[in-house]
Structures are given as C-alpha cells and as structure tokens.
C-alpha cells in the first residue's frame, strides 16, 4: 500500500497543482545541471 500511495501522490500533485509541478521540474533540472 505504501508503494502505491507513494506512486499516486506525485500524480495527484501534478493534476491539482500543475504550476507547482512545473516549478519542481525546473528546480530538479537546474539541480541536475
């Protein structure tokens, strides 16, 4: 159950908070680069 919840949580975040998801993606991309 924990694995399923952990997998679904980000999906809900991207659906309900697309702006936040974009910011997170930009931050991760900058961190990697």
UniProtKB/Swiss-Prot annotation:
Which domain of life, per UniProt? Answer: Eukaryota
Propeptide stretches are 1-10, 19-32
The UniProt family comment states: Belongs to the MSDIN fungal toxin family.
Q: Which InterPro entries did the record assign?
A: Amanitin/phalloidin
Give the position(s) of the covalent cross-link described as Cyclopeptide (Ile-Pro).
11-18
What is this protein identified as? MSDIN-like toxin proprotein 5
Q: What does this protein do?
A: Probable toxin that belongs to the MSDIN-like toxin family responsible for a large number of food poisoning cases and deaths.
One molecular function GO term is: toxin activity
Assigned keywords, A-Z: Toxin
Q: Does the keyword Cell cycle apply?
A: no
Q: Does this entry carry the keyword Membrane?
A: no
- UniProt PTM: Processed by the macrocyclase-peptidase enzyme POPB to yield a toxic cyclic octapeptide. POPB first removes 10 residues from the N-terminus. Conformational trapping of the remaining peptide forces the enzyme to release this intermediate rather than proceed to macrocyclization. The enzyme rebinds the remaining peptide in a different conformation and catalyzes macrocyclization of the N-terminal 8 residues.
């Amino acid at each position: 159950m924990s694995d399923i919840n952990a997998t679904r949580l980000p999906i809900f975040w991207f659906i309900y908070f697309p702006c936040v998801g974009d910011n997170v993606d930009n931050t991760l991309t900058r961190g990697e680069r």
